[in-house]
């Protein structure tokens, strides 16, 4: 099963997360993921971008049945576009 979740990166005490589509059986920080969908920088200051999501790829994976983690759902709402994680019917 494919999941959309966060993968931690960055240095000690300076977290940085990738939003990735990955196999649910893999560990969070294994380095293995199918596709990078964006990133989240929780310690962004000033003009730094805090959150970036590729909407079209996110929509593609959710339409294929990927499960979304709770934290990523919260981030999508913060991104102010909750429609991108709604289930879409493949045509």
From Swiss-Prot:
A cellular component annotation (GO) from this entry: small ribosomal subunit
Statement: the UniProt record of this protein carries the keyword Ribonucleoprotein: yes
Transmembrane regions: none
Phylogenetic lineage: Bacteria, Pseudomonadati, Pseudomonadota, Gammaproteobacteria, Candidatus Pseudothioglobaceae
InterPro entries assigned: Ribosomal_bS16 (IPR000307), Ribosomal_bS16_CS (IPR020592), Ribosomal_bS16_dom_sf (IPR023803)
Name the UniProt record assigns to this protein: Small ribosomal subunit protein bS16
NCBIfam families in the cross-refs: S16
Similarity field: Belongs to the bacterial ribosomal protein bS16 family.
SUPFAM superfamilies: Ribosomal protein S16
One Gene Ontology term of the molecular function aspect: structural constituent of ribosome
Superkingdom of origin: Bacteria
GO biological process terms held by the UniProt record: translation
Keyword terms of this UniProt record: Ribonucleoprotein, Ribosomal protein
Native source organism of the sequence: Ruthia magnifica subsp. Calyptogena magnifica
